[in-house]
Amino acid sequence: RGGLETEYLSEEWFRLMEAAVDEAKKLGMDVWFYDENGWPSGFAGGELLKEGNYVAYLELKEESAYSADAFASYVLVGQEYRRVAEEQGETVYYNIYICYNHSYVDLLDPEVTRQFISSTHEKYYERFKEEFGKTVAGFFTDEPQYFREALPWSKVIPSEFRKAYGYDVADGLICLFKSSDGAFAFRNDFWKLVSRLFVENYQKQVYDWCNAHGCLCTGHTIEETSLYGQMMCCAGVMPYYEYLHIPGIDWLTNFVYNEVSP
């Protein structure tokens, strides 16, 4: 975080945390550990980026040729989009690519969260386990998300999608970008899955760990102030709140508005 000189999760870091816990114990105060070096939570101060599990997103390009590098390609036949696996002699191809942002991790992948817990929560527990459920109340998570302002993706989506719905996610990805028959049904399937993966593979794992270690979890996601904002980042905050012992929301600045008069 800005201005921090102490190395995150270093021995010096935990020595200072220990001083805070000791003082809180004397004063009868609770301690809540912030689970990240800044925000958004989930990448252990950059440590998990070394594993290469970068956050992924989808990008559509309208191109003049079929691309073997695309995850899925489509052509427009009449009013319908049809998936193709080779050159079709068309003048326009709708090629969907998987892209990566190297500054954050894929929270839809359960293994990433397991690594996050091992790199963060377990270290605090190793140091302060005698105070968990006593002076140490729990952890605060800050703005975990699957991405922002782009369509989310993860390497776990193809298998999880087929398991949930019985068909290939690549058959309908164009429906996330273009309108056609069946688009609403596909979008419903896709976003329900993304919501479940985000909740279960990230927050539920943290929640279950906290339950098993005698502490609580609180915090918030991001863009809670509108449904549109939620879809960009977490596919809805209400399912997520089930796995926060103390649900939270972040409303920055003192400007309050509503959906009628934003």
Give the positions of each predicted feature:
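Substrate-binding cleft/loops of secretory-pathway carbohydrate-active enzymes
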Residues: 40-53, 144-158, 218-253
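Surface-exposed charge patches
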Residues: 22, 208, 239
